[in-house]
């Protein structure tokens, strides 16, 4: 790999120098002064369709602006021009390579322009160019050719050894490893433990597991270290008897959440120790699940907000409370109202979950509006949704009379819209469509059985994970399965 990373850009610079890049970056990407900002607002639009906004490109060979996709691509192809500048972030694109490219000299000029922009706006610079380390440079030199993961490749698929009734753990790990946002986080090496005893950190162990899954090896993995860590931090799961997969899932999220918060607190404590000496004590917050106060990767992906509205039947006064959730547990048994109907689909379950429930005379509560004890109704709705929604179908029923497993078939969709279940349906902002990517199943009775999982490996490829055995599966097999835990990923992510 050359210093520029692209021989086409190297040829361009020899012929045209950096002058055009410096001008376009200064006036249409960085906008170094007020005149540049006004010029961009007036003239920076696609020459073909006239669109403004993000994802506009400027051809560095001639005076042409085109939007991402057909227009800039058509221009570069027809004119036999190779290099364009993306104007939102100032990144170089080579049409011949079909990729964004890096050039050290261009980055130096771009940084100068960003400093001028920051000075003109009287703000700190919020953009820093990527400068590869020696290690990264060597990796790039050794891997100059791009590697494509094709649909028929099995990278990311690993069987998991059953250590003695640990199928409940294996299927949850398969679901977590195939959670796209979680995979992006751990595969980009975002976790920095900062602890002297990283061998006790569950986040470090999960990070190592992700690396193992995507190492290219096909031999089954042993999760003995993960199991040991869970036993140490969730004592109720310790032992070799069969455990509940849902309980293990929630316990794993809780321990990961606590360890993420602890790692952050230790970093802050180290930085504060060199200042005023007043360290940060987060021992209490590390064990709490505080929605809106924690930005760890677990809460960013899995935490949503449940809204509960209690309506007084006397004065119609409404008392609203909010609670964070990591999953939604749905009843499958017969209802005591509506003719004792049992749900047939996931939508039926959600409709029953969000239906107003009359609390009755035996459960009167004091109304904060009329200041008296009155009968009331209670209704759940979803205030906010996480990036990943996990549904727990409550198939194991425990009562004073009988313990049983509900094996009735519940139809669940590949994709569906959660808007009808939001607290503010009419004013709900955003896209609430979700796609199925993992299903955990239980085969057997309430006393004994076996867990397996279906996971989406590629866009249209599903596999069945049965401990150390991984086999291809059809979508029909997935949708025909019983379903115990259902994992859905949001189709469109909003970034703040």
Swiss-Prot record:
Zn(2+) 3 binds at residues 59, 62, 75, 81. Zn(2+) 2 binds at residues 46, 49, 67, 71. Its EC number is 3.4.19.12. SUPFAM superfamilies: Cysteine proteinases, RING/U-box. The active site is at 167 (nucleophile), 450 (proton acceptor). GO terms for cellular component: DUBm complex; nucleus; SAGA complex. Expressed in the optic lobe and central brain. Highly expressed in the lamina precursor cells but not in differentiated lamina neurons. Also expressed in marginal, epithelial and medulla glial cells adjacent to the lamina plexus. It is found in: Nucleus. Disruption phenotype: Defects in the number and migration of glial cells located within the lamina plexus of the developing eye; the lack of glial cells causing mistargeting of the R1-R6 axons in the optic lobe. Lamina neuron development is normal. A zinc finger (UBP-type) spans 4-120. Residues 158-491 form the USP domain. Keywords: Activator, Chromatin regulator, Hydrolase, Metal-binding, Nucleus, Protease, Thiol protease, Transcription, Transcription regulation, Ubl conjugation pathway, Zinc, Zinc-finger. One of its GO terms (molecular function) is zinc ion binding. One of its GO terms (biological process) is ubiquitin-dependent protein catabolic process. It comes from the Eukaryota. PANTHER family: UBIQUITIN CARBOXYL-TERMINAL HYDROLASE (PTHR21646), UBIQUITIN CARBOXYL-TERMINAL HYDROLASE 22 (PTHR21646:SF33). Belongs to the peptidase C19 family. UBP8 subfamily. Component of the SAGA transcription coactivator-HAT complex, at least composed of Ada2b, not/nonstop, Pcaf/Gcn5, Sgf11 and Spt3. This is Ubiquitin carboxyl-terminal hydrolase nonstop. It comes from Drosophila melanogaster (Fruit fly). The gene is not.
């Amino acid at each position: 790999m050359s210093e520029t990373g692209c021989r086409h850009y190297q040829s361009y610079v020899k012929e045209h120098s950096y002058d055009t890049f410096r001008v376009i970056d200064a006036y249409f990407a960085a906008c170094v002064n007020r005149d540049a900002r006004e010029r961009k607002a007036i003239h920076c639009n696609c020459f073909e369709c006239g669109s403004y906004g993000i994802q506009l490109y400027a051809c560095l060979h001639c005076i042409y602006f085109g939007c991402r996709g057909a227009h800039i691509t058509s221009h570069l192809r027809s004119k036999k021009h190779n290099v364009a500048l993306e104007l939102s972030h100032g990144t170089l694109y080579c049409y011949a390579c079909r990729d964004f490219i890096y050039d050290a000299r261009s980055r130096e000029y771009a940084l100068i322009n960003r400093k001028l922009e920051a000075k003109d706006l009287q703000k700190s610079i919020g953009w820093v160019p990527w400068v590869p380390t020696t290690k990264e440079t060597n990796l790039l030199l050794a891997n100059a050719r791009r590697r494509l993961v094709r649909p028929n490749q099995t990278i990311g698929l690993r069987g998991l050894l059953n250590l003695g009734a640990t199928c409940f753990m294996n299927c949850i790990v398969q679901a977590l490893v195939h959670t796209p946002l979680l995979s992006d986080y751990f595969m980009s090496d975002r976790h920095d433990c900062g602890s002297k005893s990283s061998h006790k950190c569950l986040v470090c162990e999960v990070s190592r597991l992700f690396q193992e899954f995507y190492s290219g090896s096909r031999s089954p993995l042993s999760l003995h270290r993960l199991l040991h860590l869970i036993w140490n931090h969730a004592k109720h799961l310790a032992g070799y008897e069969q455990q509940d997969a849902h309980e293990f899932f929630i316990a794993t999220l809780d321990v990961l959440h606590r360890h993420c918060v602890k790692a952050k607190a230790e970093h802050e404590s180290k930085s504060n120790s060199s200042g005023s000496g007043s360290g940060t004590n987060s021992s209490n917050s590390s064990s709490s699940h505080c929605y809106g106060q924690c930005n760890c990767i677990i809460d960013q992906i899995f935490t949503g907000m449940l809204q509960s509205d209690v309506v007084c039947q006397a004065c119609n006064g409404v008392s609203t409370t909010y609670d964070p959730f990591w999953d939604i547990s749905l009843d499958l048994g017969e209802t005591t109202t509506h003719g004792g109907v049992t749900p047939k689909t996931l939508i039926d379950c959600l409709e029953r979950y969000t239906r107003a429930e009359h609390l009755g005379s035996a459960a009167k509560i004091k109304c904060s509006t009329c200041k008296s004890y009155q009968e009331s109704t209670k209704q759940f709705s979803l205030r906010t949704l996480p990036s990943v929604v996990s549904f727990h179908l409550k198939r194991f029923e425990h009562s004073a009379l009988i313990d049983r497993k509900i094996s009735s078939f519940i139809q669940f969709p590949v994709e569906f819209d959660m808007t009808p279940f939001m607290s503010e349906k009419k004013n709900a902002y955003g896209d609430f469509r979700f796609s199925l990517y993992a299903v955990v199943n239980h085969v057997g009775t309430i006393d004994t059985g076996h867990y397996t999982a279906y996971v989406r490996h590629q866009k249209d490829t599903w596999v069945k994970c049965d401990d150390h055995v991984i086999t291809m599966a059809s979508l029909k097999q997935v949708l025909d399965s019983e379903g115990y835990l259902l994992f859905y990923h949001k189709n469109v992510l909003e970034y703040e």
